[in-house]
A protein has these predicted regions:
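Short, solvent-exposed coil/turn segments
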Residues: 18, 126-128
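Short, charged/small-residue-rich alpha-helical element at the C-terminal edge
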Residues: 129-157
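Short acidic-hydrophobic catalytic motif
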Residues: 121-125
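Short, surface-exposed, polar/charged, turn-prone segments marking secondary-structure boundaries
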Residues: 85-87, 117-119, 134-137, 144
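ABC transporter nucleotide-binding domains
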Residues: 1-91, 96-110, 114-116
């Protein structure tokens, strides 16, 4: 991290310590990174990305391969950056359950193309729980569902 600070011309006393504190690594001292857990290494990588104080942070699968504690630590770091620094964070991940705990907006990409952009509320509505019922006469289900007050349903043959 010191080398990257040097490359950016940053010589402010305590700068590295502030970044380490931001990513929850304030207590590591001179500990060698080879002794870091995977979660600690992920947070160190985020810390390195923070050198120079960017407005946008891009993270590719930041929780992939982490144990539950590591996931929680990285999630807390991301939330802290979002809330305390008002930072925009673009996360590429296939783990929607975990993203739902921190994301405000989603972009669905398939084969390199952006298919759809959704707010977290829109995504939750589209992914809400559902039941599937097989009926002999599915057309008879519509009036019953309407009388029961259901509005978000689909009847298929």
């Amino acid at each position: 991290m010191a080398t990257k600070c040097e490359l950016f011309g940053i010589r402010k006393k305590g700068y590295i310590e502030d970044i380490l504190e931001t990513v929850g690594l304030e207590g590591v001292g001179k500990k060698k990174t080879k002794h870091f857990s995977l979660g600690m290494k992920q947070r160190l990588g985020i810390g390195l990305a923070l050198v120079g104080e960017p407005d946008l942070l891009v993270l590719d699968e930041p929780i992939n391969g982490l144990d539950p504690q590591g996931i929680a630590e990285v999630r807390d770091t991301i939330q802290r950056l979002r809330d305390e620094r008002n930072m925009t964070i673009l996360i590429s991940s296939h783990i929607l359950e975990e993203l739902s705990k921190i994301a405000t907006d989603y972009g669905i990409i398939h084969n390199g193309s952006l298919l759809q952009e959704l707010t977290s509320e829109e995504l939750m509505k589209r992914c809400s729980e559902r039941i599937e019922i097989e009926l002999i006469h599915p057309e008879q289900a519509v009036p019953i569902l309407d009388r029961m007050g259901f509005t978000n349903y689909q009847v298929t043959d």
